């Protein structure tokens, strides 16, 4: 569903930005 796709996209986005935020 679109909801799950958006959730997955958001999770990937947070996972990718986490290292940058931690520095």
From Swiss-Prot:
Entry's Gene Ontology molecular function annotations: lipid binding
Extent of Basic and acidic residues compositional bias: 1-15
Tissue specificity note: Expressed in hemolymph.
Keyword tags: Lipid transport, Lipid-binding, Secreted, Transport
Coiled coil stretches, renumbered: none
Record-annotated membrane-spanning stretches: none
Function: Constitutes the major component of lipophorin, which mediates transport for various types of lipids in hemolymph. Acts by forming lipoprotein particles that bind lipoproteins and lipids.
Chain positions covered by the region annotation Disordered: 1-23
Gene Ontology annotations of biological process type: lipid transport
Disulfide bonds: none
Protein name: Apolipophorin-1
Domain of life: Eukaryota
Compartments it resides in: Secreted
One Gene Ontology term, aspect cellular component: extracellular space
């Amino acid at each position: 569903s679109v909801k799950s796709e958006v959730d997955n996209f958001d999770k990937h986005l947070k996972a990718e930005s986490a290292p940058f935020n931690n520095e």
